[in-house]
């Protein structure tokens, strides 16, 4: 039996999450799905210029897991670019540790620290929860975001 996938820490979410080749009708385009943590791995390594150990620490994974994530990401991007496919950034196994949720029933405020979406308040079990971030960091990525 395989171990459950550990959630990867992500600090960045792109404002745009869908990229298509110019000049192709949308109905003729296949898409590659790039997971949120795959984009984060490329950002840390290729833009922030961190070494593998630093990247792995930031994402709270082993160096081998980080290498697997970035290899998968680069493979998907290379295929999309060479074969004219769209890139959709979506899904994955990640946590922000940056969003705070607020329960509308009991007013409990808590961080998302082990799951990317919290469906119920850990204090009272209510499903009436909203994102309470004032800085608008998480934008549309966060379930129940207050606009």
Swiss-Prot record:
Recorded family membership: Belongs to the UPF0251 family.
Taxonomy, superkingdom: Bacteria
A Pfam family it matches: DUF134
Protein name, UniProt field: UPF0251 protein CTC_01373
PANTHER family documented for this protein: PTHR37478, UPF0251 PROTEIN TK0562
Membrane-spanning residues: none
């Amino acid at each position: 039996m395989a171990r459950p996938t550990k959630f990867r820490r992500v600090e960045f979410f792109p404002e745009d999450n869908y990229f298509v080749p110019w000049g192709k009708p949308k109905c003729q385009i296949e898409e590659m799905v790039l997971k949120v943590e795959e984009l984060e791995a490329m950002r840390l390594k290729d833009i922030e210029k961190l070494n593998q150990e630093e990247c792995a620490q930031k994402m709270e994974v082993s160096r081998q897991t980080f290498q697997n994530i970035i290899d998968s990401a680069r493979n998907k991007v290379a295929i999309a670019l060479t074969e004219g496919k769209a890139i959709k950034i979506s899904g994955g196994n990640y946590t922000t540790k940056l969003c705070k949720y607020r329960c509308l029933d009991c007013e409990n405020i808590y961080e998302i620290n082990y799951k990317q979406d919290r469906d119920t308040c850990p204090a009272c079990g209510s499903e009436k929860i909203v994102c309470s971030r004032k800085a608008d960091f998480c934008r549309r990525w966060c379930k129940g975001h207050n606009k």
